Regions:
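Helix-coil boundary and interhelical linker segments in multi-pass alpha-helical membrane proteins
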Residues: 17-41, 93-107, 145-167
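Multi-pass membrane catalytic core of lipid/isoprenoid biosynthesis enzymes
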Residues: 59, 64-110, 159-169
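Topogenic membrane-insertion module of multi-pass membrane proteins
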Residues: 1-59, 63, 76-89
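Lipid-exposed faces of alpha-helical membrane segments in multi-pass integral membrane proteins
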Residues: 7-14, 37, 41, 45, ...
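Transmembrane alpha-helical segments that form the membrane-embedded catalytic/substrate-channel core
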Residues: 44-56, 113-123, 142-146, 164-173
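Membrane-helix interfacial "entry" motifs
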Residues: 27-35, 68, 79, 101, ...
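Acidic (Asp/Glu-rich) catalytic motifs at the cytosolic membrane interface
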Residues: 43-74, 123-136, 173
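Interhelical loop and helix-boundary elements at the membrane-water interface
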Residues: 2-8, 72-84, 119-142
Length: 173
């Protein structure tokens, strides 16, 4: 589940800050802290689902990597059925919690999950395509920023300035 990588999910914080500072209407103060907590947990669970499938699909290749070869997913034989059930459970739980926040946050969470599929699973597997691998990971940062926005705001689109900074954020990572 790569809990050590949950720190990356803090990329939702700039979106939360932008939403809190720029929102005049559609602000959700009554659920402010609950939405942030649920949003962060949902984001971490979806990221974990993506890491689980990544670790499983890359285990054979990672055996030859100088540092990745020491990971448990590489050193131990994993049952495909158990991995699939863990991935499915993390996905369902993450998306279910995301749905508690609001429909826009749910859509962004589903998009982050889908990007994990595109990145890891054939026939697309952008991880194996030069430039698309980095682009896919960069788009994930934009998605996280938008997830932060939608944790706070129940509006279809953030202001253009936030949208442009999300694109810039994505281009620089």
């Amino acid at each position: 589940m790569r809990l050590d990588h949950w720190i990356k999910q803090f990329f939702i914080v700039p979106g939360i800050i932008c939403a809190a500072l720029l929102a005049k209407e559609n602000f959700v103060p009554e659920n402010f802290f609950a939405n942030i907590f649920e949003g962060f947990i949902a984001t971490c669970l979806i990221a974990s689902a993506n890491y689980v499938i990544n670790e499983y699909l890359d285990a054979e290749f990672d055996k030859h990597h100088p540092t990745k070869k020491f990971r448990a997913a590489v050193k131990e034989t994993m049952s495909g059925k158990i991995i699939f059930l863990l991935w499915l459970a993390l996905t369902i739980l993450g998306l279910s919690i995301a749905a508690l926040v609001n429909k826009y946050f749910f859509a962004m969470t589903a998009w982050l999950w889908l990007m994990g599929i595109f990145y890891n699973v054939k026939p697309i597997r952008t991880k194996d395509i030069a430039y698309l691998d980095v682009l896919t990971e960069s788009v994930n940062n934009m998605i996280r920023l938008l997830m932060g926005w939608f944790i706070i705001i129940k509006a279809l689109t953030p202001p253009r300035a936030v949208s442009y900074s999300a694109i810039g954020c994505s281009a620089h990572f």
